Every structure is written in C-alpha cells, then in structure tokens.
C-alpha cells in the first residue's frame, strides 16, 4: 500500500510539473517575439515552431517565423513562410513587401509567361477584393434586394416604386454576379497548388525517374506549381511554362 502511495504521489508531482511548465500559444508567441527582438533568431524560430506544433497558425505567426529565417539567410524557409502568411491573409502588406526582399536571394531568374489580355483584365478585376469580401457581397446583395422589395411593396408614390424596383434589379444582378465571381475565385485558388524548392540544387527530369534526361535544375526558394504526383516524384511547372519531374523530398508544398 505504501509503495502504491509513493507511486501516486510521484505521478501527481510529475503531472503538476507539466501543468506548471505548460505554456499557452500567446505566452510562447510573446517569448518568441522577445527572442527575435534580442537577435536570438534560432531560438525565436524554435519557439514559433513550438506554436505550430500545438496546432495553432495565423498570418502573423508565419510572418514572424519568416522574418526570423530571413535574418539567418534561410532562403527557402523565409519565402515558404511568407507565402504561408499571404495564403492566410493576402492583404498582409508587410509579408507582401518582405517576400520581395527574400526572393532577391534566390538564384533562379524565371520570367513569367505573358498573360492574355482577357486573363489580365479578369485577374485585375478579381484582385480588387479578397475571397472573403467576394463571398460576403452576394449576401449583401440579397439583403439589399429584400429591403428594396419591401420598400417597393409598401411605397405609395410611383416614383419611389420605380426607384426601389430598379434597386431590386441591380441588387439581384449584383448578387448573382458576385456569387459566380466568388465561386470562380475559390475554385481557382483550390485548383492551384504551389510549392517552394528547399534543396540547394535540384535536378528536374523529363520523366519521373533519375534515368531520364535532366532538363534543368532549380535552387532553393524557387516557387513552382504542383501538377501531379507519381510515387515519390512530383510534376512541377515553372512560371515560364517549363515542366518537369522532381523528387518530393526536394520541395515543400504550401
């Protein structure tokens, strides 16, 4: 009985110690930021990574983690986490600015293919708002439609009926139009998978094996589009249209 009592006491002490040492993500974030401000960048990276290990993520977390990697000249890691920050919040201006500096450390100079006039106009128009805003606009249109209908129904004067009827039509057209834009925007984002090259130098082959012809090589930090997978190989496409196969271990999907 006494032995069991000691075991229980030791177990409770260990459990209590774990509870005392346990830290919330907010506390870890604060400590990581303090480490970063003290120029202890590797320590900050470990602490920010600890928050990710807890299953927490945010645009600010990825942004700070990218900054710490940038300070240590970790090209691939900094670009990867800036991209992650922008994926969660495309309007993160700090990440938009800093990723440009990080990309200047890359070796590969890739000239994107020119867009067609129609594609350029559509991309420019869609980029006016984020996906979240486009998703809200159809709901707002329905609300305006309902309110206009009620005002139209209870109005006595003809001029007011005409005004509210016009608003009804505009709200209906706007709601339907923005719904399809939001749906197109969402599917476009979901259909595109990107990755960042992490190896110092990666050979890209014409076929998903190392026996085929080596077409070109890529270096750390280069962003590629993921097209397909086969075993431990991944088919990638560059912004300039080049296509090839690289090993999955050489890149990290966003």
Regions of interest found by a model, annotated:
Residues 111-152:
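Membrane-embedded alpha-helical segments of integral membrane proteins
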């Amino acid at each position: 009985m006494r032995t069991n009592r000691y075991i229980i006491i030791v177990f409770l002490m260990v459990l209590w110690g774990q509870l005392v040492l346990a830290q919330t993500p907010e506390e870890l974030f604060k400590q990581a930021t303090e480490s970063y401000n003290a120029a202890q960048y590797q320590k900050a990276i470990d602490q920010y990574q600890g928050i990710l290990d807890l299953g927490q993520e945010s645009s600010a977390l990825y942004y700070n983690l990218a900054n710490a990697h940038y300070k240590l000249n970790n090209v691939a890691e900094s670009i990867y986490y800036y991209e992650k920050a922008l994926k969660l919040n495309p309007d993160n201006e700090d990440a938009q600015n800093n990723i440009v500096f990080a990309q200047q450390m890359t070796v590969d100079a890739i000239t994107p293919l020119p867009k067609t006039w129609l594609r350029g106009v559509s991309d420019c128009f869609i980029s006016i708002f984020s996906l979240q805003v486009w998703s809200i606009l159809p709901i707002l249109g329905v609300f305006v439609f309902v309110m206009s209908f009620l005002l139209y129904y209870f109005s006595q004067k003809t001029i007011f009926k005409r005004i509210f009827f016009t608003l009804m039509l505009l709200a209906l057209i706007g709601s339907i139009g923005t719904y399809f834009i939001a749906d197109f925007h969402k599917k476009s984002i979901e259909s595109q998978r990107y990755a960042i090259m992490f190896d110092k130098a990666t050979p890209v082959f014409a076929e998903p094996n190392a026996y085929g012809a080596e077409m070109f090589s890529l270096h750390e930090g280069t962003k590629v589009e993921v097209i397909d997978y086969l075993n431990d190989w991944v088919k990638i496409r560059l912004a300039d249209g080049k296509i090839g196969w690289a090993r999955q271990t050489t890149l990290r999907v966003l």
